[in-house]
């Protein structure tokens, strides 16, 4: 198995962040699912790595990778933040080929960062061949910090991600919005579009095998711009399970659970606000 454990030097002491993993495809697999915009903000703490991509200060994707997923995760400051081009990072991570977790060999990764103004350095090794990449970082633009406290949640569903992906892929593309509806008295989770050919409903029964939990404290019915929901399709494609929560303002959060090696899980959160224009028109 390739690794860099024998290549540590005294230079490692200058790094404020150092990550090592035996299978770089894991991080590539997760980050590819949130790559709908180029700029990404990395936030590293003792709890792990969080990578945020957002658009128009509204829709947002966050990938979370806990320290246990890495072979080594060393951080020398309480919090480290920087911004870099995610597309460039993925090109570096995939320099040896496909990022498919099930195919081919797995390159080893070592990533380190020395602080503000310095590049992120990446070493990849596969079959004795080592590639050294450096990616320029910039001062990060502040991202929205969505406060999704449990007290504000009025609807929550845990269900199969495969089922939700199938529904999303078949939504009427002529519809500007998609509506999520559920209520304490309803036996279904309803997804509705409003296209040129009319209104189209998909009802997923509460008692079906694909729904694990459906809890609702009051009637929920909010619309979302279909174009803003599209970035959720990639995480749906690699997740085993999804938790959907809606708060009293209509903010929806999808949390995708993604299984990786050694029975560890990584998570991706997707946030999208309700379409206020449509809510006001009703």
Model-derived features: positions:
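DNA polymerase sliding clamps and clamp-related checkpoint/processivity subunits
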Residues: 1-173, 179-282
